[in-house]
């Protein structure tokens, strides 16, 4: 009896062991398939936007700082305008500084090989100091990072090409406007020269314009002196003025009251 019961138990345990082995094999197969799928899955890169770039901060600096958190791909920094750089140089020259200013940047984009790392870096480093060391020149500058969702490097290239095209069109429009103004000025000058040549005034051989103005006091006196008898009247008037000044001077010296006009002879009235 005991032998029969042991045989039955052995026969019952054999199918159980077989089912366990099949389950283990299926699990191993699923794990291997998952691993194969994971190896075939393409890693999607992610781009982080830098809104603030301190002076003298270069792409090599950002690559060295962010490579500690993940693999960094392409890096692009937008340079400042030439007008701003020219103003900085002029200010430095006016202040007596002979130091040459290098080109600074206004914004930048950093590409990470894995977008999950890019999200993690943007979320953890935002508003934190750039330099960890005490002597770092960027210690008091903060990271201004933002992860750009569904943004690829091709979008950035298209955006930069569009801005470059807009800048060229604006420059062409400004050049055309300046050319139109210059042509209008030259046409006006030529029209004025033709008008002067057609006028034929011998008093203006060089084409200069004359304007009628009111005569000055000196011109009026010269005209009166040029009249017949005008020189004698002018001589008498100057002599009378000199006599008045002499009498006033003597009166101030000796303390006598100055002679009144009634005590003097009748004054000559100038002819108008």
UniProtKB/Swiss-Prot annotation:
Source organism: Pongo abelii
Any GO MF annotation of the entry: RNA binding
Segments for region (Disordered): 1-38, 197-272
InterPro entries (alphabetical): ABT1/Esf2, ABT1/ESF2_RRM, Nucleotide-bd_a/b_plait_sf, RBD_domain_sf
Family to which the UniProt record says this protein belongs: Belongs to the ESF2/ABP1 family.
Biased composition (Acidic residues): 23-34
UniProt GO cellular component terms: nucleolus
Membrane-spanning ranges: none
Record key words, sorted: Acetylation, Coiled coil, DNA-binding, Nucleus, RNA-binding, Transcription, Transcription regulation
Composition bias type Basic and acidic residues, residue spans: 1-17
Protein name: Activator of basal transcription 1
Domain RRM: 46-142
Signal sequence range: none
């Amino acid at each position: 009896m005991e032998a029969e019961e042991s045989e039955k138990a052995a026969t019952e345990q054999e199918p159980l062991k077989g089912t366990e082995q099949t389950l283990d094999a299926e699990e191993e197969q699923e794990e291997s398939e998952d691993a194969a799928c994971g190896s075939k899955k393409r890693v999607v890169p992610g781009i982080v936007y830098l809104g603030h770039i301190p002076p003298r901060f270069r792409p090599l600096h950002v690559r060295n700082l962010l490579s500690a958190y993940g693999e960094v791909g392409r890096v692009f920094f937008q340079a400042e305008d030439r007008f701003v750089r020219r103003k900085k140089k002029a200010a430095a020259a006016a202040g007596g500084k002979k130091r040459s200013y290098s080109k600074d940047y206004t914004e930048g984009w950093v590409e990470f090989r894995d977008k999950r790392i890019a999200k993690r870096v943007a979320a953890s480093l935002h508003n934190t100091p750039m330099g960890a060391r005490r002597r770092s020149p960027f210690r008091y500058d903060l990271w201004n990072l933002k992860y750009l969702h569904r943004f690829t490097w091709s979008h950035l290239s298209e955006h930069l090409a569009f801005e470059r095209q807009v800048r060229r069109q604006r420059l062409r429009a400004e050049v055309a406007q300046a050319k139109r103004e210059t042509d209008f000025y030259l046409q006006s000058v030529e029209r004025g020269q033709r008008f002067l040549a057609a006028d034929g005034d011998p008093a203006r051989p060089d084409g200069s314009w004359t304007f009628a103005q009111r005569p000055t006091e000196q011109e009026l006196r010269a005209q009166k002196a040029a009249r017949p008898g005008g020189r004698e009247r002018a001589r008498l008037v100057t002599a009378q003025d000199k006599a008045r000044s002499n009498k006033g001077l003597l009166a101030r010296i000796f303390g006598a009251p100055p002679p009144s006009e009634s005590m003097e002879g009748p004054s000559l009235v100038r002819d108008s």
